[in-house]
Regions:
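The alpha/beta-hydrolase serine catalytic core
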Residues: 110-163, 187-190
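Conserved catalytic-core motifs of eukaryotic protein kinase domains, centered on the activation segment
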Residues: 22-24, 47-53, 112-113
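Catalytic active-site module of serine/aspartate enzymes centered on a nucleophile-bearing elbow/loop
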Residues: 184-203
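Conserved hydrolase catalytic core segment
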Residues: 73-110
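Short, aromatic/basic amphipathic alpha-helical patches
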Residues: 175-184
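Conserved HGGG/HGGXW glycine-rich cap/lid loop of the alpha/beta-hydrolase fold
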Residues: 2-46
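Active-site loop/oxyanion-hole signature of alpha/beta-hydrolase fold enzymes
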Residues: 37-75, 203
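Conserved strand-to-loop "acid loop" that flanks and positions the catalytic carboxylate
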Residues: 165-172
Length: 203
């Protein structure tokens, strides 16, 4: 837990190669009154490093799902790679995720919408800490089909038909995120606007 508070929980999901900050970003801290939590994805920050890579966005969704079970329910704020993970988790666990905010950050584009040419990449083995080079390699090329992202956006929107649970606060918009924005009911704006609106709805 990064910050105590009174009200709904908020869970921060960081970008590719990053870790949970010691304190939440100012625009988050000033816009949210409830407790704020953070999570280090596998291969990042203080989390464990598996041998030989094999990272996928779905692997990180499992990390975030475990954190969500710990806190019970939470609004998700995803940055970069964390935005994509947040969207998937919000679609899978809509009863526990009343809102999700997608923002810019490292790894937001992923590996495009279709698989590329097969290749084998061997990161430098002398690096022993985090971020795991395998995580950087695998997740930077993780495929993100537009229809896949749209499906999860629809799960979020249909689970909360009387509110606006899905906000896009990113300037960089790869194809998967453009597909999300095209869905009716998705709102665009700043992170403070999104959090203020979500917290008001949940009061």
């Amino acid at each position: 837990r990064l910050v105590d508070g009174e009200g709904p929980n908020l869970l921060l999901l960081h970008g590719l190669g990053e870790a949970t900050p010691e304190a939440p970003p100012t625009q988050v801290a000033q816009s949210w009154q409830g407790p704020i939590y953070g999570l280090d994805f596998t291969g990042h920050g203080d989390s464990s490093i598996p041998r030989g890579g094999g990272y996928t966005s779905e692997t990180l969704v499992a990390d975030a799902d475990a954190a969500l079970r710990h806190v019970g329910s939470a609004v998700l704020v995803g940055r970069g790679l964390g935005a994509y993970v947040a969207l998937l988790l919000a679609g899978l666990r809509s009863a526990q995720v009343p809102g999700v905010v997608l923002s810019d950050g490292p790894g937001i584009a992923g590996g495009g919408t279709e698989p590329g040419s097969p290749s084998i990449v061997a990161p430098a083995e002398q690096w022993a800490g985090t971020p795991d080079p395998w995580a950087l390699t695998d997740l930077a090329t993780d495929v993100r089909p537009q229809d896949y992202a749209q499906a999860f956006a629809r799960f979020v929107l249909t689970a909360h038909p009387n509110r606006h649970p899905l906000w896009v606060c990113a300037h960089v918009r790869p194809p998967w995120l453009e597909a999300v924005v095209d869905e009716a009911g998705v709102l665009e704006g700043s992170i403070p606007d999104a959090l203020t609106d979500l917290e008001r709805d949940l009061a």
